[in-house]
Regions:
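Conserved short beta-strand edge segments in small beta-sheet-based binding/regulatory domains
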Residues: 550-557, 644
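Bacterial N-terminal signal peptides
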Residues: 11-20
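M16 family metallopeptidases and their MPP-like homologs
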Residues: 56-129, 134-142, 194-215, 233-354, ...
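Bacterial N-terminal signal peptides that target proteins for export
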Residues: 1-11
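Proteolytic maturation boundary segments
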Residues: 24-52, 135-141, 145-219, 230, ...
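Long, His/Glu/Asp-enriched segments that create or flank divalent metal/ion-associated functional microenvironments
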Residues: 218, 222, 226, 701
C-alpha cells in the first residue's frame, strides 16, 4: 500500500504532466475564476461574492458566512421566520441557519429580487447579521442580479458594520493522522432490511493546492473510483446471488468540509443477508486496492463519466451550488473555476491510458486499506450481530480478495459492438416540411416513419425522443401496482446476442442514455448521446426493437431486488387517490410476477413492430446532411406493420374530498397531493406555474412558526381525463437550524396551518408586482427550456403524446395571465381531491 501522505504528491506530479504544455516546471498556477463570480473586500473588511446566475428571472439567494463561529455560538436571535415569510422567503431543507464544519452559514433562498423593497430589506437584514458578529465573515449574493448595482448597495450597508480584518481561508491546524484502529457501529431496528456501509478516510488536498489543477485531478479520480466500485459491487452481488436495494456511494471532499476526505460505500439488503453482503463489499474493495483496474476498465469508466462532466461544464449551476462554492472558497480556499475547467482537463490526451491508469490505481491504493482509517456500520442490523465477529469476517474477506485473483472482466465492454451490425433496406425522404411550433424540420420516409430534427451546434451531444403511442391502457389484464414495472422490463433483455447487463454497459460506455417513459396512452424512449455516436445509437435502437430475447436470470435478479424496495411517496399518494386504478406507473410490492414480463414482451413487440405509428425526435450538435444520410441508411431496419390495434377505453374515478393517513417508513414530513379535473389548455398550463408561486407564498406565511421546508411540483394529464395536480412536500428542519420565533414543530399543528393556507390561498390578494414577477419567471423558464435540445425533445414528445399544442403561443398565454385565472386554478385544486400522508 502507498502511504497516504504521499498520494497528494503523486497527484501534483500528474497535474504537472497534464498541464506541461503551459506550466513551468515544479509549479501549479491558480485556476481561473468563473467569469460569473466577482470577489473582493467591502470597506468594512468583509469579503463579498456576487454571482450572476440567470437560471431564475427575478430571484436570488443571499448567504452570510461566519468563519470558525459555530451556530450554537452565533448571534441568531435576530433571525425571524415571521419577517422572512413576509419577504416571501421560505427555508430550504437545512433551514435558514446551519453549522458547516464549525462555521455558521445563514442562507436565504429564492428571494424575490424583482421587488426593489425586498432586495433592499434582505440586504440590510443580512448585514445586520454581519454587524452582530466579530467573526471573519463573507456575504454571497447569487442570482438574476446586476453585480455592479449589488456591489454599490453592499458598500452602503457595510457602513453599519465595524471595520474588521479578514484573513484568507486557512487550515494551519490540520494534520493528517492515520487511524490504525477500525471503528465498528451497529444500529438494530425492526426493519426487514439492513444497510451495510464502509467509510474510508484520507488526507485532504493541501491548502496550497486547493485552487490548482491538483484539486481537479483528485475530484475526477474520486468520481471515477466511485463509478468503478459501484459497477463492480453490482456485478459481485449478482454473482453471489444476493438481492440488493440501493447501492449508495458518496464522498465528502476537501471543498465540502475542513477535515479528512471520506468515501462511503453502502448497500441495502435483506436482514438475513447482512453478513454475506458485508463480505462481498469487503472483497470488492480489496480487489481494487490490491490489483487495481485495467487500462480498459479505467478508459471505459471515463467514457461512462463523460456525460456527467459535460453536463456540469455546459449547464448553469444552481444558486445553491454557487453559494456552496463561494462558501468553500471562503472557508477552505477551494477553487472558483468554472466547471468547464474540469471538462478541459478531463478531455486532454496528454497521458497514455496506461500511465493515467497507474496514477489512478495509486490513488485507490492510497485510500483503500484493510483495516486502517476504516468505519464499518450496520444500520437495521440483527440484534444478534457481534461487532467483533463482523470485523473479523470483514478482515478475512479483505484478505481473500487481496490474495485470490479474480477471473472476471470488469470493463464496460465498450469495444464489443460488432454484434450490432445490421443490413437494412434503404429508404428515402418522401416529404419534408417545417415543424410549426419549434422550428424543426419534419421528414416523412418512404416506409412511413417520421423524424423531426433541429440542429443546435456546439454542445457535442444530441438528445432524442422516440414516441410510439399506445400506453399502459393497451395491456390487457394489467394489475394494480404492476404498471410501474413494465418499462423496466426493457432493460432486462439480451440484445443481438449480447447479455442484458453487457448491453447496458455497452450503451453506458458509448455515452448513450435510454430512459423509458410510460403513461396511460403513450410509450416513449428518451435520452442523449455524443454526436459521434449517432450511428451507434441507431444500430442499438434497431437491435433493441428487433433482436430482443428474454433473459430469465436478469428478471429473477430484478424481481428479488425489487422485493426489497418500498413504494415511492409519489406512488403511495397516487395509489391513495385512485385506489384500484391499474393503468399507472406505480410500483406496489408483490405485484411483480412472471406474467408481468410476458405482458411486457407482448406489449413491446406490438409497439416496436409498428414504428410508423410513432415519431423520432432529434435535436443537438448534428449536421443535417449526415443525419439524413444515416437515417436513409438505417430506418429501413425498423418494422412497419400496417395492421391496427384496438384501443381500450379507460375509466378513472379518483377520490374526492380529503383523505388523511399516518404512515411510517418514510422521511418525517407532511406529504399532500391536490387533484382536480381541469381542462389542459395552454392558458391553464402556464397559469399552473404562477398559481404554484401564490400557493408557495401562502404556505410560507402559514408555516413560518413551525419550521418546515416547502417543495411544490405541478403535473397535468390528458388521459383518461384532463386533470391537474400539485404535489406538496413539507419536511421538518433540524431543530438546531431554526430561528427563535419558531414555536413548535408539532406535525398536527403544522398540518392545521397547511389546511388554513390551502383554504385561503385562492382568496388572498395578489399584488401586481408579484403577478408580474411570477409571470416573468415562468416566461424565462419556458423560453430557456424550448431553446435547449432536451427541451425541444420534451416539448414535442408532450405534444405528440397528448395531442395538445401548449407551446406555439406560450408568450401570449403567459402575458395574458391575470389574478382571476390564478384564483380559478387554485380554487379548483384546493376544492378537489386531497390526499394527506403524515409521517411522524
Amino acid at each position: 500500500m502507498i502511504p497516504f501522505k504521499f498520494h497528494h504528491t503523486a497527484l501534483a506530479v500528474l497535474a504537472l504532466v497534464v498541464f506541461s504544455t503551459t506550466v513551468p516546471a515544479q509549479t501549479l498556477p491558480p485556476l481561473p475564476a468563473d467569469s460569473r463570480i466577482k470577489k473582493g473586500n467591502l470597506p468594512c473588511g468583509v469579503v463579498y461574492y456576487t454571482v450572476t446566475n440567470p437560471s431564475d428571472k427575478g430571484y436570488a439567494d443571499i448567504a452570510v458566512i461566519q468563519r470558525d463561529q459555530p451556530s450554537s455560538a452565533a448571534p441568531t436571535g435576530q433571525v425571524s421566520a415571521a419577517f422572512l415569510s413576509r419577504m416571501g422567503v421560505s427555508p430550504g431543507p437545512e433551514g435558514y441557519i446551519s453549522d458547516v464544519d464549525g462555521s455558521t452559514v445563514y442562507h436565504f433562498r429564492d428571494i424575490p429580487f424583482y421587488k426593489p423593497e425586498v432586495l433592499d430589506s434582505m440586504l440590510l437584514y443580512s448585514f445586520l447579521q454581519v454587524a452582530l458578529s466579530k467573526a471573519q465573515q463573507a456575504v454571497v449574493v447569487s442570482g438574476d442580479i446586476d453585480p455592479v448595482e449589488i456591489k454599490k448597495k453592499m458598500d452602503i450597508f457595510s457602513m453599519m458594520v465595524p471595520k474588521m480584518l479578514v484573513k484568507e481561508a486557512h487550515r494551519p491546524d490540520y494534520v493528517w493522522e492515520s487511524s490504525p484502529a477500525p471503528w465498528v457501529e451497529a444500529y438494530p431496528s425492526d426493519s426487514p432490511v439492513a444497510r451495510v456501509s464502509v467509510t474510508y478516510s484520507g488526507a485532504r488536498v493541501p491548502f496550497e493546492f486547493m485552487n490548482t489543477a491538483q484539486a481537479i485531478v483528485s475530484d475526477l479520480f474520486g468520481d471515477e473510483l466511485q463509478l468503478v466500485l459501484r459497477h463492480r459491487l453490482e456485478r459481485n452481488l449478482q454473482d453471489a446471488g444476493i438481492p440488493h436495494g440501493l447501492i449508495d456511494i458518496h464522498s465528502l471532499r476537501s471543498d465540502d468540509y475542513g477535515s479528512d476526505e471520506q468515501y462511503t460505500v453502502a448497500v441495502t439488503v435483506a436482514k438475513e443477508n447482512t453478513d454475506a453482503a458485508m463480505r462481498v463489499l469487503s472483497t470488492t474493495l480489496a480487489e481494487v486496492d490490491s490489483r487495481g483496474v485495467t487500462p480498459q476498465e479505467f478508459t471505459d469508466a471515463k467514457k461512462v463519466l463523460t456525460p456527467q462532466v459535460r453536463h456540469r461544464a455546459v449547464g448553469i449551476p444552481s444558486r445553491v451550488d454557487d453559494i456552496q462554492r463561494c462558501t468553500a472558497n471562503f472557508l477552505y480556499g477551494a477553487s472558483l473555476a468554472p466547471y468547464s475547467e474540469t471538462m478541459r482537463y478531463f478531455s486532454r490526451k496528454t497521458l497514455a491510458d496506461t500511465t493515467e491508469t497507474r496514477f489512478f490505481n495509486n490513488f485507490a491504493d492510497a485510500l483503500l486499506s484493510q483495516l486502517e482509517n476504516l468505519k464499518l456500520e450496520f444500520t437495521g442490523a440483527p440484534d444478534s450481530l457481534d461487532k467483533d465477529q463482523e470485523l473479523f469476517n470483514y478482515n478475512l474477506a479483505y484478505l481473500f480478495g487481496s490474495v485470490v485473483p479474480t477471473e472476471k472482466d470488469h470493463s464496460w465492454h465498450s469495444a464489443d459492438s460488432s454484434a450490432l451490425k445490421v443490413s437494412c433496406p434503404r429508404v428515402k425522404i418522401k416529404s419534408e416540411k417545417k415543424e410549426a411550433v419549434t422550428g424543426g424540420t419534419l421528414w416523412t420516409f418512404t416506409n412511413g416513419m417520421r423524424v423531426i430534427f433541429k440542429p443546435v451546434p456546439g454542445s457535442g451531444v444530441f438528445h432524442y425522443g422516440l414516441q410510439l403511442g399506445g400506453g399502459l391502457a393497451q395491456i390487457p389484464d394489467l394489475k394494480e401496482g404492476e404498471g410501474g414495472y413494465i418499462g423496466d422490463m426493457l432493460s432486462l433483455y439480451d440484445v443481438a446476442d449480447i447479455p442484458a447487463a453487457q448491453f447496458r454497459d455497452l450503451l453506458a460506455s458509448g455515452g448513450v442514455s435510454m430512459e423509458t417513459e410510460l403513461s396511460v396512452n403513450s410509450f416513449s424512449l428518451k435520452g442523449e448521446a455524443p454526436s459521434g455516436q449517432f450511428q451507434f445509437f441507431l444500430k442499438s435502437l434497431i437491435a433493441l426493437a428487433n433482436r430482443r430475447k428474454v433473459n430469465p436470470s436478469q428478471y429473477q435478479l430484478y424481481s428479488r431486488n425489487q422485493a426489497l424496495a418500498q413504494p415511492s411517496m409519489q406512488d403511495l399518494l397516487y395509489q391513495k387517490l385512485v385506489p384500484g386504478f391499474v393503468y399507472t406507473t406505480n410500483k406496489l410490492p408483490g405485484k411483480l410476477t412472471l406474467d408481468t414480463q410476458k405482458k411486457a414482451e407482448k406489449y413491446f413487440e406490438e409497439r416496436f413492430s409498428r414504428m410508423q405509428d410513432g415519431i423520432l425526435i432529434l435535436s443537438g450538435d448534428l449536421k443535417e446532411e449526415e443525419v439524413k444520410r444515416l437515417l436513409m441508411r438505417y430506418l429501413g431496419g425498423f418494422r412497419t406493420d400496417k395492421s391496427t390495434l384496438p384501443r381500450r377505453a379507460v375509466a378513472l374515478r379518483p377520490l374526492s374530498g380529503t383523505t388523511q393517513q399516518t404512515v411510517e417508513g418514510y422521511p418525517a414530513g407532511i406529504y399532500i397531493l391536490l387533484d382536480a379535473e381541469y381542462a389542459v389548455t395552454s392558458d391553464h398550463y402556464y397559469t399552473s406555474f404562477v398559481a404554484m408561486e401564490a400557493l408557495r407564498r401562502s404556505l410560507a406565511r402559514h408555516l413560518a412558526p413551525y419550521g418546515y421546508s416547502i417543495e411544490l411540483e405541478t403535473n397535468n394529464f390528458t388521459q383518461p381525463q384532463e386533470r391537474f395536480q400539485i404535489e406538496i412536500t413539507l419536511r421538518p428542519i433540524p431543530s438546531d437550524n431554526l430561528p427563535e420565533d419558531v414555536r413548535t414543530q408539532d406535525p398536527e399543528r403544522a398540518l392545521s396551518a397547511v389546511h388554513a393556507a390551502l383554504a385561503s390561498c385562492a382568496s388572498e390578494p395578489l399584488s401586481g408586482a408579484d403577478l408580474s414577477g411570477w409571470k416573468a419567471r415562468t416566461l424565462s423558464q419556458v423560453k430557456r427550456e424550448l431553446d435547449s435540445p432536451s427541451g425541444f425533445v420534451t416539448t414535442l414528445l408532450t405534444r405528440y403524446t397528448s395531442n395538445k399544442d401548449i407551446y406555439s403561443r406560450y408568450s401570449e398565454s403567459i402575458s395574458a395571465i391575470d389574478a382571476a385565472q390564478v384564483k380559478d386554478f387554485l380554487t379548483a385544486l384546493t376544492s378537489g381531491g386531497r390526499i394527506v400522508l403524515l409521517v411522524p
